[in-house]
Amino acid sequence: VDRLPLVDVDSSLSVADRAIVWDLRAPRVVLGLLVGALLAGSGAAYQGVFRNPLADPYLLGIAAGAGLGATIAIVARLQDAIGFIDPVPLAAFAGALLAVAAAGTLSVRRGRTGSPATLILAGVAVANFFTAIQTFIQQQNSETLQQVFAWILGRLSTAGWGEVRLLVPYAAICMAGLLLSVGSLDVLAVGDEEATTLGLRPRTIRRLVLMTAS
């Protein structure tokens, strides 16, 4: 507590105790809170778009797309080729956006966007396809299998303040975007025709929300 600004408390902690609390435990707690908030916001956005209380990132293949992107980056050893930035999160984000685009394209029929149920079915197909590609890549590159699984499953044991500082801008931008779209999602819950009558563009709103949630 005495490390916080404007707080004058004598904690009587040793240097080792301070290092354990501030350098090891605190960043894991903060990172866990940020990740949990982002997952909750993302899930709420998906449920608002699909009007389905069971919607999650797996329905559109977003998780599979992110896993495939990360797998390609790890297997291709892009971390060694690009030293100034970690390419794995960027590749995962690109894979997630690709999954959204693929599911959205498959759900379009005769130039019109399909129903949320059609989009979900397209997402399941995209998820299975991307998962099959990811599994094939893993089988062909067994030496990186452990690293790939460690990234996909996720862990906080190695988290530090560097990871927290890296995540904060993304969390702030994405959560702000999702909060700004709450009103539009409420209108979409009534129906696309009513939303169009009020001057909204349901298709554009869904795309923006899905991209932000991804």
Where do the PLM segments sit?
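Alpha-helical transmembrane segments in inner-membrane proteins
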Residues: 1-214
